[in-house]
From Swiss-Prot:
Keywords: Metal-binding, Metal-thiolate cluster
UniProt-recorded Gene Ontology molecular function terms: metal ion binding
Binding site for a divalent metal cation 2: 6, 12, 14, 25
Binding, a divalent metal cation 3: 14, 18, 23, 28
Gene: mtb
UniProt keyword Metal-binding present: yes
Protein name, UniProt field: Metallothionein B
Amino acid sequence: MDPCECSKTGSCNCGGSCKCSNCACTSCKKSCCPCCPSDCSKCASGCVCKGKTCDTSCCQ
């Protein structure tokens, strides 16, 4: 199962009141991908999740 639900639906919620579109949060700084590492303050747009961690090049 793909850890990034938004890659299939194009939208998702990233916790609390955060809303996402195209796998990017529109109202918070964290990526909507739950597999992004917690020390990532923001994941680059178009980030592809592999397994349960983002590639480090996703972090910005």
